[in-house]
C-alpha cells in the first residue's frame, strides 16, 4: 500500500555530559534508531537528532575535580558519546551540544517571549545553601527522604520511586551531596515559569489520545495534585547561560536542555544551508511530525514544562512522546560491583552492536515496561534466532547456488504461494514497527524464519544435489531459500544494520521494503562469506570481568595537580574583588645573600617601584633572565618585614615547587600598572 511521505523530526533524550554512555542509555537510542530506520525505508523524510546536555552544577564541579574547564570536559565527553553511538550504528543526522550559540539564542528567544506574554514571575525564595562550600545547592545536589512516599536517598527535584516532583526544601532531613553538610536556608530572587496558566491546554493535549495510556494516567494524577510554578533560574556559580538582564542568574539546566532539540536541528539546518526547514518543523502550525523518545524518569519535564514552554513562546508542541522503562541486568538493577553496570564502549570490545540491538528490539513494546538484559538468555537468543534461523538459511542454500550454478538464481519461484505468505506479512510487520511493538515484529519475523527453514528441511537440497537429472530442482529449491532469506533480512534491516550490509553484499542488491514484492529471478549473487558468528558465555564472562576492572580503575586515587593540591574553599565575589592584581615589569632580579630560596625583584608598576622577595630561586638559577619580563603581582598586599628587608607585594607563579615553579606572564600588549580583571 502506497504511503504519503511525511516530514518527521525524531529526538532522543540528551545524555548528560559528565559521564559515559552505558547499556541503560542504549535502550532508548536503539529503540529510536530502529523506528527511524523503518520510517526511512518507507520513504519518509526523517531528521534524527540528539545532543549532549552540557550545563549545570554537576558539570562545573566535576570539571573542577578534574582540573580542567567545563568547556574542555564537555568537548571530550561529546567526542566519547558520539563514538559510542556510531559504534552502535545510531544513524543520527546531527549530534550537537546544549552549550552552543544556537541553543543560547533560542533559549533567550523563548524566555523573552514567555516574559513578554506574562508567563515569567519574580519572587524571593528561601533556598538551601551549603555553608561549607559557600554555594546554593541545585536540586540534584541535595538528597533526603521523599516528602510524598517517604523513600530515602532521593534527589531534591524528583523522586525516582514514586515519580513526584517537589522543591528541595520539602525534602525530609536533607544533606548536601557536595560536602555532606546539613544545608541552611538563604534568600535569593528567582524567576518562575507560570506552569498553572497552561493547565487547561495540557489537559486537552493529554486527552487527545496521542500519548501512551500510562503517560496520560500519570499526567492526570499531576493535574489532580495541582500544577506549581517552576523555578527556571539558578544562582552563580553555575555553568550555563546567564539570563538576559539578570547578572549572576542563570537558566536552570532543564530550561535549556529540551530547547537543545531545537538547537541541534537549527545547527543541522545551518550546515545544510537550509533556512526554511527550521520554521517548517517548529512553527506553530507546522504539519511536520515531532517525536521525543525518552525514559520514564523525565516524563514530567517533557509532558508538562516542555509543551507549555513551546505553547507560551508560539512554537509547536510535540506530536507525541514515546516513553520506555529502565534496563535491568540479570533481573536486578545494574551493578558496578557485579560487573553489570556496562559501558557502551566496553560492550563493543566483546560483542558487536547488532547483537544488543536485536535483543533489546525483541523485548521492546509500546508500553513503559522495564527491559531485563538476561545475559544467558541473550547468548541463547542471538544464536538461536540470528545464527540458526536467519543466517543459516542463507548459508545452507548459497553453497549449492555458488558451486553448481555460478551464483545464478532460478528464473522461477519454486513455491510462489509460500513467497506470497512472506510478502503478505509486510503489512503486519510494518504496522508493528510503526506502532513500536517491536517484540511482536520480531516474533512475526522469526515465525517466518521457522517456516523458511521447514521448507528447506522438507525439500532437502543436500539429498537432491546427489540425484542425477535434478539440477533444475536443486537450483529452484536453493533459490527459493535465498529469496526467503532476502525477505527476512528486509524486515530485519531496521534492527541489524551491519548484518544487512553483509547480506546486501552477498545478495548483490539493496534491500528495500517495496522491493520484496519482486523476487530475485535469474539474478546473480556473490560468493557466500560468513555473515555472523556464534557467541558464547565466555564472552559474557569476559565482559562482566572487564566492567569490574573499569570500576576498580575508576575508584583508584586521583592523581595530578588537584589531588596533590586541592582547590580551596569557595570565596565570594566580594572577597575576590579585594585582591588588586596588577601587571608589573621586572626591572631587576638578583640573589638574596643569606637565602637559598629567595630572589629580590624590583618591579615597575607604571610610575611606582616595588621591592618584592619571591621564593622562586630554585626555578630561576639565572635571575638576570627575568629582567625585562612582565608578570602579575598582588599590589595591595600588606608590606611584610623580613630579615632581608621589606617585601611590598607578591608575584604570581604556578607549579608544585622546586624546579617546577612557573612565573605567570600576561599576553603581549599588557602594560605595567594594568589591572587584572
Curated annotation (Swiss-Prot):
Localization of this protein: Cytoplasm
GO annotation (BP), single: methionyl-tRNA aminoacylation
Keyword Nucleotide-binding: yes
Pfam families membership: Anticodon_3, tRNA-synt_1g, tRNA_bind
Membrane-crossing segments per the record: none
Residues binding ATP: 336
Main location: cytoplasm
Stretches of the chain forming a coiled coil according to its record: none
Entry note: cofactor: Binds 1 zinc ion per subunit.
Disulfide bonds: none
The organism's place on the tree of life at top rank: Bacteria
Motif range ('KMSKS' region): 333-337
EC number per UniProt: 6.1.1.10
Ligand binding (Zn(2+)): 146, 149, 159, 162
The keyword Transferase is assigned to this record: no
tRNA-binding domain mapped to chain residues: 575-677
InterPro entries xrefs: aa-tRNA-synth_I_CS, Anticodon_Met, Met-tRNA-synth_bsu_C, Met-tRNA_ligase_1, Met-tRNA_synth, Methionyl/Leucyl_tRNA_Synth, MetRS_core, MetRS_Zn
Keywords on record: Aminoacyl-tRNA synthetase, ATP-binding, Cytoplasm, Ligase, Metal-binding, Nucleotide-binding, Protein biosynthesis, RNA-binding, tRNA-binding, Zinc
Molecular function GO labels: ATP binding; metal ion binding; methionine-tRNA ligase activity; tRNA binding
HAMAP family xref list: Met_tRNA_synth_type1
UniProt family annotation: Belongs to the class-I aminoacyl-tRNA synthetase family. MetG type 1 subfamily.
Subunit record text: Homodimer.
Function, in words: Is required not only for elongation of protein synthesis but also for the initiation of all mRNA translation through initiator tRNA(fMet) aminoacylation.
Designated name of the protein: Methionine--tRNA ligase
Taxonomic path: Bacteria, Pseudomonadati, Pseudomonadota, Gammaproteobacteria, Enterobacterales
Gene (name only): metG
Amino acid at each position: 500500500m502506497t504511503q504519503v511521505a511525511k516530514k518527521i523530526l525524531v529526538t532522543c533524550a540528551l545524555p548528560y555530559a559528565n559521564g559515559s554512555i552505558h547499556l541503560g542509555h542504549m535502550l532508548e537510542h536503539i529503540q529510536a534508531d530502529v523506528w527511524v530506520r523503518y520510517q526511512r525505508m518507507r520513504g519518509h523524510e526523517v531528521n534524527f537528532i540528539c545532543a549532549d546536555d552540557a550545563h549545570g552544577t554537576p558539570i562545573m564541579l566535576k570539571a573542577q575535580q578534574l582540573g580542567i574547564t567545563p568547556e574542555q570536559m564537555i568537548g571530550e565527553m561529546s567526542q566519547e558519546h558520539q563514538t559510542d553511538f556510531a559504534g552502535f550504528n545510531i544513524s543520527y543526522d546531527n549530534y550537537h551540544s546544549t552549550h552552543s550559540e544556537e541553543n543560547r539564542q533560542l533559549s533567550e528567544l523563548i524566555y523573552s517571549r514567555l516574559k513578554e506574554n506574562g508567563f515569567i514571575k519574580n519572587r524571593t525564595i528561601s533556598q538551601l545553601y551549603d555553608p561549607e562550600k559557600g554555594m546554593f545547592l541545585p536540586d540534584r545536589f541535595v538528597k533526603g527522604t521523599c516528602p510524598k512516599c517517604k523513600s530515602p536517598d532521593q534527589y531534591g527535584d524528583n523522586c525516582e520511586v514514586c515519580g513526584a516532583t517537589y522543591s528541595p526544601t520539602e525534602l525530609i532531613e536533607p544533606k548536601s551531596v557536595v560536602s555532606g553538610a546539613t544545608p541552611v536556608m538563604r534568600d535569593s530572587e528567582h524567576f518562575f515559569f507560570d506552569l498553572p496558566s497552561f493547565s487547561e491546554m495540557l489537559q486537552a493535549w493529554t486527552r487527545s489520545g496521542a500519548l501512551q495510556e500510562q503517560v496520560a494516567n500519570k499526567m492526570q494524577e499531576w493535574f489532580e495534585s495541582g500544577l506549581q510554578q517552576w523555578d527556571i533560574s539558578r544562582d552563580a556559580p553555575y555553568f550555563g547561560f546567564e539570563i538576559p538582564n539578570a547578572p549572576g542568574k542563570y537558566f536552570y539546566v532543564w530550561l535549556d536542555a529540551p530547547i537543545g532539540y531545537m538547537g541541534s536541528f537549527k545547527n543541522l539546518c545551518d550546515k545544510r544551508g537550509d533556512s526554511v526547514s527550521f520554521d517548517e518543523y517548529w512553527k506553530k502550525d507546522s504539519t511536520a511530525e515531532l517525536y521525543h523518545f525518552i525514559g520514564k524518569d523525565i516524563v514530567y519535564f517533557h509532558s508538562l514544562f516542555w509543551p507549555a514552554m513551546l505553547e507560551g513562546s508560539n512554537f509547536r508542541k510535540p506530536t507525541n512522546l514515546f516513553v520506555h522503562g529502565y534496563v535491568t541486568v540479570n533481573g536486578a538493577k545494574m551493578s558496578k560491583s557485579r560487573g553489570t553496570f556496562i559501558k557502551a564502549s566496553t560492550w563493543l570490545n566483546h560483542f558487536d552492536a547488532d547483537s544488543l540491538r536485536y535483543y533489546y528490539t525483541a523485548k521492546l513494546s509500546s508500553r513503559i515496561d522495564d527491559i531485563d538484559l538476561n545475559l544467558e538468555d541473550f547468548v541463547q537468543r542471538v544464536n538461536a534466532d540470528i545464527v540458526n534461523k536467519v543466517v543459516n538459511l542463507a548459508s545452507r542454500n548459497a553453497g549449492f547456488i555458488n558451486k553448481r550454478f555460478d551464483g545464478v538464481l532460478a528464473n522461477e519461484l519454486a513455491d510462489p504461494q509460500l513467497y506470497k505468505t512472506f510478502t503478505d506479512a509486510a503489512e503486519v510487520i510494518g504496522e508493528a514497527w510503526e506502532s513500536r511493538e517491536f517484540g511482536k515484529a520480531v516474533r512475526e519475523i522469526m515465525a517466518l524464519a521457522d517456516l523458511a527453514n521447514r521448507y528447506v528441511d522438507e525439500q532437502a537440497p543436500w539429498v537432491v544435489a546427489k540425484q542425477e537429472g535434478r539440477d533444475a530442482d536443486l537450483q529452484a529449491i536453493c533459490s527459493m531459500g535465498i529469496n526467503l532469506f532476502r525477505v527476512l533480512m528486509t524486515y530485519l534491516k531496521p534492527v541489524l544494520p551491519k548484518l544487512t550490509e553483509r547480506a546486501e553484499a552477498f545478495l548483490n542488491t539493496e534491500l528495500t521494503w517495496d522491493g520484496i514484492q519482486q523476487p530475485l529471478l535469474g539474478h546473480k549473487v556473490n560468493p557466500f562469506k560468513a555473515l555472523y558468528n556464534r557467541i558464547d558465555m565466555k564472552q559474557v564472562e569476559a565482559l562482566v570481568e572487564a566492567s569490574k576492572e573499569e570500576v576498580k580503575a575508576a575508584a583508584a586515587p586521583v592523581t595530578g595537580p588537584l589531588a596533590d593540591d586541592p582547590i580551596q574553599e569557595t570565596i565570594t565575589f566580594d572577597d575576590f574583588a579585594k585582591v588588586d592584581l596588577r601587571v608589573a615589569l621586572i626591572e631587576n632580579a638578583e640573589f638574596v645573600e643569606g637565602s637559598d630560596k629567595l630572589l629580590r625583584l624590583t618591579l615597575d608598576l607604571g610610575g611606582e617601584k616595588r621591592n618584592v622577595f619571591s621564593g622562586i630561586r630554585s626555578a630561576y638559577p639565572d635571575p638576570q633572565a627575568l629582567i625585562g619580563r612582565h608578570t602579575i603581582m598582588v599590589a595591595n598586599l600588606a608590606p611584610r618585614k623580613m630579615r632581608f628587608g621589606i617585601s611590598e607585594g607578591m608575584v604570581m607563579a604556578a607549579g608544585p615547587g622546586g624546579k617546577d615553579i612557573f612565573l605567570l606572564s600576561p599576553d603581549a600588549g599588557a602594560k605595567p600598572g594594568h589591572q587584572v580583571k
